Swiss-Prot record:
Principal EC category: transferase
Single annotated GO MF: flavin prenyltransferase activity
InterPro entries with a match to the protein in the record: Flavin_trans-like (IPR036551), Flavoprotein (IPR003382), UbiX-like (IPR004507)
Lineage per the UniProt record: Bacteria, Pseudomonadati, Campylobacterota, Epsilonproteobacteria, Campylobacterales
This protein's name: Flavin prenyltransferase UbiX
Annotated S-S bridges: none
Gene: ubiX
Length: 187
């Protein structure tokens, strides 16, 4: 299976890194981080995103967001699934309105036109009517809108356990088997 992970410049970069860390090793992963993602990772978490991604997934393929001619920009390359974690509202707007000027939005556009799973984890609060309309437009185009929302039924005691719940739910939405969080009613 081939999966693209897009990391845009919204708050919550550690969630993308946790997703990358927990992704089953047999999945071939292609990662595109926006320029702003690198800035936000450093400012918010003191993380060198380029190094962190390569440390977590040495076998991954990493692209520059401006590499619009990369293999993953074409539907014929055969990417099976894509996740954008976190998804900035700027990125959401670009995808919702068909602007594919960078590799993340172009790859997402390909997923929509090819009717392949595209998970978008919007990271903003509160949401304006325009933001909600853009998310609705993407949902109508069969994108999976899955914001990083906390849960309490799992009784998570650590930040890592909360992150694993989110990553597990995202994996579920993409059809990736996992045991990252306790299932409701299964003790």
């Amino acid at each position: 299976m081939k999966l693209v992970l897009g990391i845009s410049g919204a708050s919550g970069i550690p969630l993308a890194l946790r997703f990358l860390e927990k992704l089953p090793k047999e999945i071939e992963v292609f990662v595109v981080a926006s320029k702003n993602a690198h800035v936000v990772a450093l400012e918010e978490s003191n993380i060198n995103l380029k190094n962190a991604m390569k440390d977590l997934r040495p076998s991954g393929t990493f692209f520059n967001e401006q590499d619009i001619h990369a293999s993953i920009a074409s539907g014929s390359y055969g990417i099976h699934k894509m996740a954008i974690i976190p998804a900035s509202m700027d990125m959401v707007a670009k995808i919702a309105h068909g602007f594919g000027g960078d590799l993340i939005s172009r790859s997402a556009s390909v997923m929509l036109k090819e009717k392949r799973p595209l998970l978008i984890a919007p990271r903003e609060m509160p949401l304006s009517a325009i933001m909600l309309e853009n998310l609705l437009k993407l949902s109508h185009s069969n994108a999976i809108i899955a914001p990083p929302m906390m849960t309490y039924y799992t009784q998570s005691k650590t930040l890592e356990a909360m992150q694993d719940f989110l990553v597990g739910k995202w994996f579920d939405s993409l059809g990736i088997e996992n045991d990252l969080y306790p299932r409701w009613g299964m003790n």
